[in-house]
């Protein structure tokens, strides 16, 4: 992507080193902002936001383990939140400075955990459509999608980019109203080309293995949320089943800056000028 610089760092997990890839924007001496994507996505989701922030911030957008350009893990059972947190901790140590955190869904969960730790380098936290409580019903929906038998999207092979775009317009309709150009970019960024010329989604299809045969329970992180002593912002898709209205209201009552995005579910794509400007204003406050 023009304006970005690719990079990677080593991190230690389960007795060996892997590499985590990222794209970096802006002046390396500027205040750092770390943007962490959702479960089946990658760091390219933040291109528009990163480009908009790059005049003021150093923006770093990693690919989580098993996604994008980052290495796949030997043991698929390691594709769990605590190991993503560990890898991201290595990235924060590499950055070596106080850092703002923007996290969508899984990226926000990792942000809550890291921001609650003693001595955290995270100084501001933006949560995109995720909060300290996630209902089991929504987690079951995600599990069922991820481990679907037969035509699982994790295993699907696509003949061309048009078929990928049609697939993404269906499964990611909750991202909100996107332009044709935005959908086309999402398709390009979401896939890798296979040796036979077909395309597959740009992640290790085994990322769903920890979910297989598992019946999710409610996730309650209010104790962690209450330990976070930094400025917080929360963005909610108005029809989201991940970030419920009661949770959103309780986060606002605790002092979080709040933005609700109409005609959007899980999760806002952060491509809209209103969303980008709200985040920028929060980071600059």
What residue ranges belong to the model's regions?
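Alpha/beta-hydrolase fold catalytic core
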Residues: 1-33, 55-57, 96-97, 274, ...
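Active-site loop/oxyanion-hole signature of alpha/beta-hydrolase fold enzymes
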Residues: 15-16, 48, 60-103
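Conserved HGGG/HGGXW glycine-rich cap/lid loop of the alpha/beta-hydrolase fold
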Residues: 23-72
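Conserved hydrolase catalytic core segment
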Residues: 97-139
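A catalytic-pocket lid/entrance helix-loop region that shapes and gates access to the active site
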Residues: 131-159
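Alpha/beta-hydrolase
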Residues: 161-230
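Conserved loop-alpha-helix segment in the C-terminal half of the alpha/beta-hydrolase fold
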Residues: 227-264
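Catalytic histidine-centered segment of alpha/beta-hydrolase-like enzymes
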Residues: 264-274
């Amino acid at each position: 992507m023009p304006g970005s610089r690719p990079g990677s760092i080593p991190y230690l997990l389960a007795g060996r080193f892997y590499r985590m890839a990222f794209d970096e924007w802006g002046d390396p001496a500027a205040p750092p902002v770390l943007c962490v994507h959702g479960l089946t996505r990658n760091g390219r989701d933040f291109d528009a936001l990163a480009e908009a922030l790059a005049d003021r911030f150093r923006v770093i957008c990693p690919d989580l383990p098993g996604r994008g350009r980052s290495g796949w893990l030997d043991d698929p059972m390691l594709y769990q939140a605590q190991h993503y947190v560990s890898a991201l901790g290595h990235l924060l140590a590499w950055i070596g400075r106080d850092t703002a955190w923007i996290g969508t869904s899984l990226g926000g969960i990792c942000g809550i955990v890291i921001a609650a730790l003693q001595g955290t380098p995270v100084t501001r936290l933006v949560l995109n459509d995720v909060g300290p409580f996630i209902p089991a019903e929504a987690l079951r929906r995600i599990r069922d999608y991820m481990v679907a038998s037969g035509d699982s999207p994790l295993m699907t092979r696509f003949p061309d980019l048009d078929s990928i775009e049609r697939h993404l317009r269906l499964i990611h309709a909750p991202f909100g109203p996107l332009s044709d150009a935005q959908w086309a970019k999402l398709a390009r960024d979401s896939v890798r080309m296979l040796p036979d010329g077909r395309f597959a989604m740009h992640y290790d299809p085994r990322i769903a293995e920890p979910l297989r045969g598992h019946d999710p329970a409610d996730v309650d992180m209010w104790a962690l949320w209450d330990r976070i002593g930094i400025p917080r912002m929360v963005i909610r898709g108005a029809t989201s089943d991940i970030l419920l209205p009661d949770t959103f209201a309780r986060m606002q009552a605790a002092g979080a800056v709040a933005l609700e995005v109409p005609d959007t579910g899980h999760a806002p794509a952060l491509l809209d000028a209103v969303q980008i400007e709200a985040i920028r204003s929060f980071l600059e406050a």
